[in-house]
């Protein structure tokens, strides 16, 4: 089976020191469910196995046993060239994504050519009860709709989200920090008017101040907008 073949290849690339370092950064992951394969090697394997006629057997074999298998799954999905097929695989995989790393590594190339359909699906993801599905939806709006396809309806939608989940709120902060760098005039009112919860508001400001894309003048102004607890 292709799943066994992929697992054997991953185990052959095991780096125990890297695994032990990595699991400290990813809550919930342990030495028992992580192999320790470095990202460049995972990407190489993903490109290789994505060409296989039987790759669907691996993509259907959910949930996976190892974190590294989730990672290679995300990279394989990112290589799918047909939009409908790719979107179907993303939607099937997202409920099994249980960590920020797998969520953030998944970035299908084909989405760039289908932004209208992507925007509709991203809006649905934001209504999900699953932490990493919401995070992925925000990430897609950040990656694809802050430049030429920007519309204020996107920050408006995201500013209305409320969650007790750290990894949702951190992505909201990341979104607004990136949005301030790319669409300052349209997005700064969300900070001025305190449209986010206090923690996310202050985190968005912090991340903006840390960004080289924000001017010194903008950073100075943002400092005046911090909410003191």
Model-predicted regions and their roles:
Residues 1-229:
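Alpha-helical scaffold domains
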């Amino acid at each position: 089976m292709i799943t066994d073949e992929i697992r054997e290849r991953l185990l052959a690339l095991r780096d125990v020191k890297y695994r032990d370092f990595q699991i400290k950064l990813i809550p919930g992951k342990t030495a028992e469910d992580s192999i320790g394969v470095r990202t460049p090697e995972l990407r190489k394997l993903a490109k290789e196995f994505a060409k296989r006629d039987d790759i669907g057997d691996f993509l259907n074999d959910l949930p996976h046993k190892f974190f590294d298998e989730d990672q290679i799954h995300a990279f394989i999905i990112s290589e799918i060239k047909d939009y409908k097929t790719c979107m179907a695989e993303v939607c099937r995989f997202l409920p099994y994504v249980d960590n920020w790393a797998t969520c953030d590594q998944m970035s299908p190339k084909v989405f760039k050519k289908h932004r209208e359909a992507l925007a509709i699906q991203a809006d649905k993801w934001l209504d999900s009860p699953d932490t990493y599905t919401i995070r992925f939806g925000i990430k897609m709006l950040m990656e694809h709709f802050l430049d030429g396809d920007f519309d204020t309806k996107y920050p408006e939608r995201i500013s209305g989200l409320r969650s007790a989940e750290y990894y949702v709120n951190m992505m909201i902060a990341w979104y607004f920090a990136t949005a301030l760098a790319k669409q300052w005039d349209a997005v700064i009112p969300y900070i001025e008017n305190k449209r986010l919860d206090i923690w996310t508001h202050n985190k968005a400001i912090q991340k903006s101040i840390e960004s080289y894309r924000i001017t010194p003048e903008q950073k100075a102004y943002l400092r005046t907008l911090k909410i003191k607890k």
